[in-house]
Design a protein with these regions (language model features):
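Membrane-proximal envelope and lipid/glycan-remodeling enzymes
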Residues: 1-529
Length: 529
């Protein structure tokens, strides 16, 4: 375990800083909760723009003491115990499925080589904690086959899975169904009552939470769900292509190689784990996959696959040696190339295919983008007042690090766009857009597309600026930008850089100003008129 922890830390250091804007959407809710404003987005926007309730609450805990500062760092701090839980859980799962102590330890070591798990941890998203809870829930369930005391742990772990991510109902529902069938199969009234006593409290908690969030936010499911609901309809092959690429390029198929052996050996725990892996992959195909460059949707099955592979290897080698076969040493070494290939495919630090290089490039791009958004937030804070309605497609960072009331353009954190929008001009795996919704949303500020902060002179006319506001052509069918908005800029004279924005006219003249930090806010094209 210590060796695996050391390798994981070394892997994190080698990968370096990883950030994704979507993580900061959840951080915005956590920050507001920590500051006593409730689980709302940006400045008082009541929308369920997160699908990770439990993680949102956990990240809020340390933010109470930092007064909302350093959300990414605090998320990593809160994620560290889940790294330990993941290592312990995959060890227990492998042991419960029949692996020897040594092979179970190998299973833990495999986790430390998985770059996607490292990236998931570094982003501060719920990904790794969710993976850890799923693994723990299955480890506790399989362990309960031999020790009934683990049933309560399994039940509450299943609830934690369902609260950690909205689609946690998939593993939790499968576990509930399995426990029910097991209890009914015994045809014992005592077993059925034990099942009800164990499971009922967790179901009550889940139903109470679900009803609360439905009442509080007003939608049956989070806006993130509605924002991406069109993906499987408009790109019906996207989910299959996503799963196929992850399974083949990441060599995840290696984990299922030994599953038939365990089924033949009648390992009930392995049957459950392998069945869930298949169900989970089918679910990901149905919802259309994901765009994030670290296999996020398939990661919950990775530790389970490692446990299956190590358990099958351990049992196979043990069987070969007990049979005292003449070629037992050769047969015992047969799984070694499989393990070597798996390590090469999951570790992206050294040898990479074009697919993996593309993902690493995507990670670097996302990290660079977030740094640019953070810098832009400092400029926008000079002009957008508290509660000002700012339209942006970078809702995470700007929702977390400005005090604007964000109109999030993808619908991830905007219920109006999520439920009424379409996909005009966008890919549905990112969300929706709704140009016709903007008169109702009453925007007050827009900003230019990346790079938001540019060296002067950046634009020569109002038309140049409008052409660099995302979706201004579509939104312009419903809002007269030239009549209702003026073009301004936040200038940093020391560096010669500026961020251009649109500000809604309210009848009063636009007056230039200078902040204590040396920023100048002016309206260059207004003064020329």
């Amino acid at each position: 375990m210590m060796a695996a922890a050391g390798l994981f830390v070394a892997h994190c250091i080698r990968i370096g800083d990883v950030t994704i804007d979507d993580a900061f959407i959840t951080f915005s809710f956590s920050k507001n909760l920590a500051l006593g404003h409730g689980p709302v987005f940006s400045h008082g926007v009541r929308v369920e723009g997160y699908s990770t309730f439990l993680w949102m609450v956990l990240v809020a805990l340390p933010l109470v003491f930092t007064r909302g500062a350093a959300p990414l760092g605090m998320a990593r701090v809160m994620g560290a115990p889940f790294v330990a839980l993941l290592g312990w859980s995959v060890y227990r799962l492998a042991r419960a499925c029949g692996a020897s102590r040594r092979m179970a330890a190998v299973c833990v070591l495999l986790l430390s080589f998985d770059t996607d798990l490292v990236v998931g941890y570094l982003t501060g998203m719920e990904t790794l904690p969710y993976v850890a809870l799923v693994t723990f829930a299955f480890a506790a369930t399989v362990q309960s086959f031999f020790d009934a005391r683990w049933q309560k742990w399994a039940a509450w772990a299943g609830l934690a899975v369902a609260l950690m991510r909205i689609d946690g109902f998939v593993p939790w529902g499968m576990l509930l169904g399995w426990w029910f069938l097991m209890a009914m199969g015994k045809r014992d009234a005592i077993e059925i009552k034990r099942f009800v006593r164990t499971v009922a409290p967790t179901v009550v908690v889940y139903v109470a939470w679900f009803l609360w969030r439905w009442h509080y936010y007003g939608l049956f499911l989070p806006s993130t769900y509605y924002a991406k609901a069109l993906l499987p309809k408009l790109l019906p092959n996207n989910g299959f292509e996503y799963v196929t690429a992850e399974v083949l390029e990441g060599a995840l198929w290696c984990g299922l190689v030994g599953w038939p052996w365990l089924l033949w050996r009648r390992r009930l725990g392995a049957a459950l784990v392998g069945l869930y892996v298949i169900v989970h992959w089918i679910y990901v195909v149905r919802v259309g996959g994901d765009w994030m460059p670290f296999g996020r949707f398939l990661l919950p099955t990775v530790p389970l696959l490692f446990a299956l592979l190590c358990s099958a290897t351990s049992d196979f080698v043990g069987t070969v040696f007990r049979a005292r076969h003449r070629l037992r040493w050769l047969l015992a070494l047969a799984p070694v190339p499989l393990f070597a290939w798996l390590v090469v495919r999951i570790d992206h630090r050294f040898v990479n295919s074009d697919f993996e290089k593309g993902r690493l490039s995507g990670i670097a791009d996302q990290t660079a983008n977030v740094k640019a958004y953070l810098r832009a937030a400092g400029f926008l804070n000079q002009v957008v007042p508290s509660g000002g309605r700012l339209v942006t497609d970078y809702g995470g960072v700007l929702g977390c690090f400005t005090d604007a009331s964000i109109i999030e353009m993808w619908g991830l954190a905007n219920a109006t766009i999520a439920t009424r929008g379409d996909t005009e001009g966008v890919r549905p795996n990112y969300g929706r857009t709704c140009a016709a919704c903007y008169p109702e949303l009453k925007p007050e500020y827009f900003h230019v597309m990346v790079p938001m902060v540019r060296r002067e002179p950046a634009f020569a006319s109002v038309d140049d600026v409008l052409a660099n506001v995302w979706q201004s052509d579509a939104i312009g069918r419903y809002i007269d930008f030239k009549r209702d908005f003026g073009v301004g800029r936040v200038l940093q004279p020391r560096t010669g850089e500026a961020l251009y924005f649109l500000r809604k006219r309210d009848g009063s003249p636009f007056t230039p100003s200078k902040s204590e930090r040396g920023f100048v806010v002016d309206y260059p094209f207004e003064t020329r008129q």
